[in-house]
């Protein structure tokens, strides 16, 4: 009876809205796709897609399983990032070797997102996220000196990919597409802004830069915290 009543925007709404807005820049290419995985019923799915149309949110794919687990379908949909407001679901996905991200409230209502600002801003942690945890293990086992020695020795060797590497490389590919659009426009503003945050400090940044170049990523911001808390 409520199928025509729009659902309220969730915690991931602003991110998803800006992500899908990027597709408008490239027509049929559609570099980004969003899939909804829900344990709700297909009837609820009907209301969900009606809500998407209400908010002009072009989500086209989904699975509604009436109480059954949706995890078996993550790989079926070839998902590069599984997002959920449920921390336990995210942790389970990660334990299954799937790329997961926990969406937490920002303290700002989704509808308050600036509709005139379409730039998508994403900050990535480096170690254990973009790359594997080799360097982190070295730090835990051999201390800072061992970690620095490893990174300096392998300064020209890219790191092994981490859990979000696939998503990261897709964003890098989008950056190249976006750069082509602004090639002849000196006032063109990139549609996506990527920041890298890491506990590293010099000289271990050299291998980080090598890895980013190998992945084709042009980060707008790089924060080398040298051990300072990332929460700052």
Walk through the language-model features, giving the residues of each.
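Short acidic loop-to-helix transition motifs that present clustered carboxylates
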Residues: 65-71, 108, 226-232
